[in-house]
From Swiss-Prot:
InterPro entries for this protein: LpxK, P-loop_NTPase
TM regions (residue ranges): none
Protein name in UniProt: Tetraacyldisaccharide 4'-kinase
Chain sites annotated for binding ATP: V68, V69, G70, G71, T72, G73, K74, T75
Amino acid sequence: MRFSFFSGIRDLFRHLIISATSGALSDRLGWLWAVIARVFSGSVWLRHKIAKSPHQVQATVVSVGNIVVGGTGKTPLVLWLAQALHERGLSCAVLSRGYKGKYSKKKAFTIVNPALHTASCVGDEPLLLAKYLPSGTVRIQKDRKTLAEKSAGDFDVLLLDDGFQYNRLHKDVEIVLVNGSDPFGGGSFFPKGRLRDFPERLAKADYVMINGRCSPSDQRELDRLHPEEKIVIEPQISEIVWLNQSVNMPRDHWEGLGVGVFCGLGFPKGFLAMLRDAGIHVLGTYLLPDHVGITKQELELFCKKIILRQGVGILCTEKDSVKIGALAEEISFPVGEVRMRFSCVCNERRMVAMLDAIEAIQKNKRVTT
């Protein structure tokens, strides 16, 4: 019961971010956000304090998480990790809570199938992962301990998506991803800032990865909290695919491209900066809260706005694309998804060592079970 209580508090606070970042309203209610942030940090401390001994399963459990509310680029990392382990001959499943998906509340787990499910059913991130990973390997259930128990016999490795704060399951490897431009979520707990956990808990992570470059002061603080070498990654555009056009856009056509951009991300500034770094001219934006999809009316109005500014199309992330589904085909103005992958720009040797360590743990478990 207490875990449902804490989950309910977390969901409520995440929902409040819509109001907490709304300009003048946020300024007027700053005192309220500070009070709620104090309560939230207390609930986080209490949850860690009363956590019981975690349950162990026979498969190797690898957690990928963060310490802030959204916006670190965790989904592309989970995708890369699952594919990298698969290339090493390890069977791997992604276990997700299925946040914002109505099927996550079912007593039985759901195997995500892009041909059958929508983002409203299973959540946008699990649906996106299932688009690229082998059939049957992305599973959702709110009770991830039970989900792990039911999946452990079928896979070598279980990737626990957003698992750093999940205390009910033993994790063999803890990976934490932080955003290089704001690794500590503004220095305050949500909703005053973006923290969802204490930065000091980075000491418990086996590997800390940084998405983008840090300022020297943030890098020093990260090194103080987690002395081991950090792995630095950077997202890059791999391709732009039009959802309602018969042709795609060659890379040499990106320079100077005038577009509108809509997205529902925890940290949209990073996505917009990546587009601008690629030479794409952003004529206007329509920003939604994390995990929230755009409606047909909103998209049509935004398209008209960008047409008036002489734009050639609308771009969104793949996470937004899976939420709109076939809606793009009802729009005559070009709508495209930006496909991203990351590259390791610092300490690739440690990233390979991380994969080696996961493989070694799995082999040892196989021998002892």
